[in-house]
Amino acid sequence: MESNQTIKLHCLENRAASGYVTFGSYWGKGTLVIPNFKNDGMDSFVLKNEKKESIPVQSRITAWWPDGSIKWAAHTADASKMGQEAALTAQIKSGEVSEETAELVSMIIRRDDNWLYIDNGVLSLKVPTGKNKADTLAEDIFLNGKLRVKKASPVLYLEEQGNENSTNFDLDGQTKVTRAYKAAIKAVTIEEDGPLALTIKAEGSYQHQNQNKMKFCIRMYINKDSSEIRFVHTFFFDGDEQTDFLKGLGIRFDTVLEGRPYEHHIRFAGELPFKEAAILLNSSYPRLQPAVLKKQLDGKTWGYPEDSDVEKAAADLPVWNRYFLYQDSADHYRIGKQTKSQCCVLSAAEGRRAHGAMEVCGENGGILLGIRDFWQKYPSGLEVTNLADDNASCTAWFYSPEAKSFDFRHYDTRSYQMTSYEGFPWFGASPEGIAVTSECTLSVCSSLTAEDELNTFANRVNKPPVYVESPIAYHEKRAFGYWSLPERKTEPEAFLENQLDQLFDFYKNEIEARKWYGLFDYGDVMHTYDPIRHCWRYDMGGFAWQNTELVPTYWLWLYFLRTGREDVFTVAEAMSRHCSEVDFYHFGPMAGIGSRHNVRHWGCSCKEPRVSMAGHHRVYYYLT
């Protein structure tokens, strides 16, 4: 057994070294045994940046060797302190911690039968855990003592279809009624409780008039001295695909805004900056100079007298209470705004790929809200309603209600066993038990941020930091078994390496060219190309979506280990996310197995354990 072993880490290119990050460390068999390892591991590892400054790090063990030594550990730290490179050292002797680390304590300051009371040094909030947990994830979120968010709640809209006689019908004669479901939280679990990282899991279903449909699992990640809370939302299909169509899915934040309506700002990050307010100080009579509007949108201090032209104009200008950003495809978004629900929606702006973040802010603060993979997992959206009021509702839409409802049904009512290679003669397509995960981040602010800060926030949400060792280091320690490093000394070796490079580049380019995006599709690729139609066989069951056939997950993760390329990591991460969620049955009659390649990810009668085996995603799990 060795002591004081050091692992050298670096942040992947195109990833901002900011915000909190969790990374993995690998230890050879028998090389690391830490007696009396504590749950948070604060005294078991030392993390230092390039300046040799010690950084607090929270740790937990994720895998052991048969001899009881540590194989893999997971560590959480502040990436802004780590910088581009850092070194992690294991300490055999416990108790050797810095003064800063020694002062850290749990962020749960109090708990009772109904609430968890949390204070991370910047944010304070309470999480319902008892009978009163009802439909909220968190309540009373304060920033430095000032209430900014009253509550955070999951939101589900279902379009329910049938054939009964109804006044609500479409041209096809089907009844179509959209209903709003509230969350019914059944269980709240503390998964990690340390001085740097707190993870809380909420599980439940959605309810409308005592009818429960669909399920969810939502994790909240809270970190020391951070004004941000990350929400990882997993939706499970638990309904009837013949009648239940997804119309809206997200998390809503009831936000407190101070100041007058014209001091209530809305901004969207994007290709072009979009910034407006509930009332825009753009008046012909009384005449307001352009400088007034500029000052307003820049969030400058006011102090206008009650009888000023500004106040007179504000009392007689349109009040834009609702703004929304809607990404309707991988290549188009729209921004709309509305005064009242009984009035039309104005199209305010359009573009290609939104950055997926908005800021809603009053005189003394508000929130930033961002969705990861915003355009990749369309139809997504961001919305604020009641912007002019003291209490505005801000929603991160993982599936925007602006979109046509999502249809979970199969493409036919029978199986094409022989002609389309769809397995068995019986009909086996079912979405019951499949899932999909989305992420959003809430950042609470004390004032309107600088213009570039919203885009910086959006970039961090979309491209969070990833810290890894070099391919050489992983190879030397035989992490993840036996594999090779790139070698081009001989002609056959050079040929094979070039083929691997070209193969990855081909699929990376096909994802973009074929637009393999969307909430339930992003991360997967197609199985077989049709040279006659010059497209992939998207409509033939045995040849359409890959669904881990020929294990592209293994190929991509091994390719990442060999190259350390950030673009490879991004594609592999998306595939692991998709294949472990959408292609996999999490409950129901086929729980634990997955669906092989098909037109719909949950299609045909071929349900196989090879699709759902853990080996597909072990690299992703242990590295992150």
Question: Where do the model's predicted regions map?
Answer:
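Solvent-exposed beta-hairpin/edge-strand motifs
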Residues: T31-S54, A138, R252-F268
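Solvent-exposed beta-strand/loop surfaces of large extracellular or lumenal domains
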Residues: V46-A73, D407-T419
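Carboxylate-rich, divalent-cation-coordinating active-site regions
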Residues: T89-D113
